[in-house]
């Protein structure tokens, strides 16, 4: 019992409303939204959290600032190195450009577009109004990680930087969910 409490402690300490074995709170992003890259052209379309089922996912919600991106970079690097199967796994990165340093939003969007070119199988959502942060009750200037099973149910959630042990836990969980 103590071990379970210790494992859950980081999740209990966060203010977010992401509950294990439930779906994320429903939210849509219509201003910008999901970034597409087809025929060397970028476009945006509306996105809704109801679209998160169908694949095992890591959803990374980050403020539109370098310091937030760096918080969970060790997990993202571990995911890249694992070469997870694109037909059954997807990383969904939601960038809150409403929480960017004033005057940097265009640079943030350019960085997201570069990432989409490099990782076309990944999903990038640009949230210009901070709708997802508000709906999920996430901390400002931060980074949250949510692991979803293929039904879209939360298996892990933390608002803040993951410890090395949590990175390992998430990677082991992803491999289990993909079996």
Description of each model-found segment:
Residues 1-6:
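Sec-dependent signal peptide recognition
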Residues 10-14:
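N-terminal signal peptide c-region/cleavage motif recognized by signal peptidases
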Residues 15-24:
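Cleaved targeting-peptide boundary
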Residues 27-56:
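A short beta-strand-turn-helix
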Residues 60-115:
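Structural microenvironment flanking redox-active thiols in thiol-disulfide oxidoreductases
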Residues 64-67, 97-101, 129-132, 154, ...:
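Solvent-exposed loop/turn segments at secondary-structure junctions
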Residues 90-94, 106-139:
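Short, internal strand/loop/helix patches
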Residues 141-179:
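Thiol-/selenol-based redox modules, centered on thioredoxin-like
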């Amino acid at each position: 019992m103590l071990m379970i409490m210790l494992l859950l402690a980081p999740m209990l300490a966060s203010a977010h409303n992401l509950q294990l074995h439930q779906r994320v709170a429903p939210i849509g992003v219509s201003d910008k939204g999901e970034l597409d890259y087809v025929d060397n052209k970028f476009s945006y379309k509306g996105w809704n959290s109801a679209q998160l089922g169908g694949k095992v996912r890591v959803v990374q919600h980050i403020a539109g600032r370098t310091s937030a991106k760096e918080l969970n970079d060790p997990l993202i690097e571990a995911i890249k190195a694992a070469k997870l199967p694109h037909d059954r796994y997807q990383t969904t990165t939601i960038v809150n450009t409403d929480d960017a340093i004033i005057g940097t939003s265009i640079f943030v969007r350019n960085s997201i577009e570069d990432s989409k070119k490099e990782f076309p199988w990944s999903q990038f959502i640009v949230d210009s109004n901070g709708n997802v942060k508000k709906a999920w009750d996430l901390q400002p200037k931060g980074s949250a990680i949510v692991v979803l099973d293929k039904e879209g149910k939360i298996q892990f959630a933390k608002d803040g930087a993951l410890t090395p042990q949590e990175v390992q836990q998430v990677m082991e969980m992803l491999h289990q969910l993909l079996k």
